[in-house]
Amino acid sequence: MDNNKVLEMRNIHKSFPGVRALKGVDFHLNKGEIHALMGENGAGKSTLIKVLTGVYSKDEGQIFIDGKDKAVSIHSPQEAQKLGISTVYQEITLCPNLSVAENMYIGRSNKIYQNWKKMNEDADKILQNLDIPAKASQQLASCSIAVQQMVAIARAVDMDCKVL
């Protein structure tokens, strides 16, 4: 596999009762590239993303992350995250009653904070680097929908992901 390829999917198949959603899909993503999946309703865009992120298991095919065959390992979104695959959902999946920083770090094994001040400082740095107009200590519910989505992106970016 090419050293620039951060993601490669080969011959991916996925079927549901009475429907073949994916038939032999091949796809690769080089480091630094941005791609968009486009197609008609029912074309398999969401299914492909859900196979990649471990929401659905694939019927056939291989998935490589940084040249390593990870197809056997991706059986849940948590396993996908450990492999460096992070997801920002179209629907906001954050907790409005928590602060921005709490939303960025909740449920994360790679960043555990005992010190709230340090957590807020780290979150503020990330927000500032990404030009997100929010403060770490701010309640998420007080942010606009657009800023809430930016916080979700900041959370994903800060996970040191290879594929977002």
Predicted regions mapped to residue ranges:
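Glycine-rich phosphate-binding loops of nucleotide-dependent enzymes
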Residues: 1-164
